């Protein structure tokens, strides 16, 4: 878990009780508690004691956004499962879990110091878009998907799809249709197809704000949306950010688009559970819907604020939704044309 904006406070007694039950806290008086901000789905604390520094994460029933966005708190259980599985199959690619309280739906996990675990979103914001990092992220994500595709024991740990629908498909695709009635049919069709395609264990929130650049490779955090799902979602969810960053840091557009390209190549090289072209085709068709959802869905990206920039996203996404591409570089080509208008 990364350290973002800090605000010292005191947690409630229920949280304190869980930590004491876990043996991770003796007296709260002797510990330092700090709220970690930056996310919308959970209450997150950094806890410092004489013996250990760690994070506590408790899922919220209503997400911290303007829209009414609710999701089952049981997602905390599946985040824990995802982290433990990835810790076994790809050591170092997820935070270590120390404790999970099934009753209160909170977990305690490893704290990853920002000094050697840079937040990828912050790096991209500052124009440090190293294609090697994108290649590494694509390769690790692809390997996680590949290993999970053939492991029934992993698949049995994710019996639910309703959480993924509530926290991903509805807010990003279906809610977007309310502002684009002409695209309702295609957006709901994408939601349905994605929901019904479940060959691998997916993370569900693979944006750069949830990827830390560690000394031994990328570390994926905040896997609250984890489930058996469509790998195209994880890939598209990350790739759309390289497109959006072209508006945030225009001077680095070519580097962002290069990151897009190398991540695609590295990821597809790991695909083993189905034909690579099938994964790429679904990703290319889904990406425009998620792209549009970051402007007109329930969780609009905070750095695209000018109406002219929003309209660029809308035009490009609409064209691609109406005439779906089968290759991901076709999406890049359309976006380049829009940026140069």
List each model region and its residues:
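Juxta-kinase regulatory segment immediately upstream of eukaryotic protein kinase catalytic domains
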Residues: 1-33
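Active-site catalytic-loop/activation-segment of kinase and kinase-like phosphoryl-transfer enzymes
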Residues: 2-14, 110, 143-193
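ATP/Mg2+ or Mg2+-diphosphate-binding catalytic cores
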Residues: 3, 251-254, 290-341
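Short Pro/Gly-enriched beta-strand edge/turn motifs at strand-loop
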Residues: 24-31, 79, 184-196
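Active-site acidic catalytic loop and adjacent metal/ATP-binding pocket
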Residues: 34-50, 54-56, 189-233
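ATP-binding pocket architecture of kinase catalytic cores
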Residues: 36, 41-153
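Active-site activation/catalytic loop segments of kinase-like enzymes and analogous catalytic loops
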Residues: 81, 232-273, 287-305
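Acidic, serine/threonine- and proline-rich low-complexity regulatory regions
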Residues: 270-282
């Amino acid at each position: 878990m990364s350290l973002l904006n800090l605000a010292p406070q005191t947690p409630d007694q229920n949280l304190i009780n869980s930590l004491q039950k876990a043996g991770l806290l003796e007296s709260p008086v002797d510990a330092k508690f700090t709220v970690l901000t930056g996310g919308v789905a959970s209450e997150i604390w950094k806890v410092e004691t004489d013996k250990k520094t760690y994070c506590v994460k408790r899922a919220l029933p209503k997400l911290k956004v303007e829209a009414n966005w609710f999701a089952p708190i049981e997602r905390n259980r599946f985040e824990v499962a995802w982290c433990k599985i990835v810790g076994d199959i790809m050591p170092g690619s997820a935070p270590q879990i120390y404790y999970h309280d099934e009753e209160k739906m909170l977990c305690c996990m490893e704290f990853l110091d920002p000094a050697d675990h840079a937040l990828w979103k912050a790096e991209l914001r500052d124009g440090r878009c190293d294609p090697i990092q994108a290649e590494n992220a694509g390769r690790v994500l692809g390997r996680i998907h590949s290993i999970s595709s053939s492991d029934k024991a992993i698949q049995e740990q994710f019996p639910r799809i309703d959480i993924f629908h509530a926290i991903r498909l509805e807010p990003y695709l279906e809610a977007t249709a309310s502002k684009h009635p002409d695209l309702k049919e295609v957006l709901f069709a994408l939601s349905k197809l994605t929901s019904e395609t479940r060959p691998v264990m997916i993370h569900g929130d693979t944006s750069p704000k949830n990827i830390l650049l560690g000394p031994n490779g990328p570390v994926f955090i905040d896997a609250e949306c984890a489930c058996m799902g469509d790998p195209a979602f994880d890939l598209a969810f990350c790739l759309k950010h390289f497109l959006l960053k072209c508006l945030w840091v225009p001077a680095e557009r070519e580097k962002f688009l290069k990151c897009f390209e190398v991540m695609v190549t590295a990821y597809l090289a790991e695909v083993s559970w189905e034909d690579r072209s099938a994964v790429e085709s679904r990703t290319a068709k889904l990406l425009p819907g998620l792209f549009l959802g970051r402007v007109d869905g329930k969780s609009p990206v905070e750095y695209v604020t000018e109406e002219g920039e929003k309209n660029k996203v809308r035009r490009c996404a609409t064209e691609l939704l109406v005439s779906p591409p089968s290759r991901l570089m076709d999406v890049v080509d359309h976006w380049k044309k829009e940026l140069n208008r």
